[in-house]
Amino acid sequence: MGGGCPYSIYLNTEEKNISFNGLDIEVINHSKNMKWSDRLIDSLKKIKTKYVILMLDDFLINADVKQDKIDQCINWMDQNPDVAVFSFASSLWKDIDDKRYEGFVLRPTEGEYRFNLQAALWRKKQLIKILRKGESPWQTEHMGTFRSRVLYSNKKFYASEKNVPMIIPYEFGGAIHQGKWTEGTPELLRKNNISMVDYSIRGFDPKSTEEWSKLRLDEVPVIKKKSIKIKIGEYLVALGIIKARN
């Protein structure tokens, strides 16, 4: 997995610092009191590029990145301003094969998790527009999906085709599933000379990566039904019409 990274890397974190030979890393520190989405918005505004590849901290790359495919996606976005994102992970739901971009399918406007935090190439301005302050990652995916439907139905959200090699290869859903380590993570960390991890604190997810990636649609965790009053309130907050109560 050699070859380095041709891009600048921005690490959005609270107080850690890091450097690595051969990599252009800029650490953006934030207060622990800041909400997750506030930190992400602030970090994105400090990045000067037109596009960003968003990756969460448990997306541990386990094979060579297909750089030529990323370059191709950038070219497509340059030529097509209606494209908001190319997600490098496939969805678990039915998508639209519009045959516009090889290896990608269109997420339906009403699709579950149309907005999500899987590894993806984003048009930075569009990503910032969808985000709102005061949200956790899970709230961001839920509310961001709603905002993408209502405010940005004219924008195209693409995901990788199912059953094709990932452009940025990592375990489906990341190294942590529902707060627990995946079974394959220790071996991957050992291969990369990372050994000081106490796996007993989190424990291990009983589901394998293969099980997660083959879940039937009715088994995928979705937002539970709530009263209409609560639901309307959440959506008004998502759109920024009212403020959430502390």
How should each PLM-predicted stretch be described?
Residues 99-112:
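Short, flexible, basic/aromatic active-site loop/helix in glycosyltransferases
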Residues 64-94:
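Conserved donor-nucleotide/metal-binding helix-loop-beta segment in metal-dependent transferases, i.e.
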Residues 1-31, 46:
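N-terminal anchoring/stem segment of glycosyltransferases
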Residues 41-51:
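Active-site nucleotide-sugar/metal-binding loop of Leloir-type enzymes
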Residues 50-60:
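Short beta-strand-to-loop acidic/aromatic patch adjacent to the donor-nucleotide binding site
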Residues 195-246:
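Membrane-proximal basic amphipathic "stem/tether" segments
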Residues 158-206, 210-211:
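PAPS-dependent sulfotransferase catalytic core
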Residues 115-180:
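Catalytic core and acceptor-binding pocket of nucleotide-sugar-dependent glycosyltransferases
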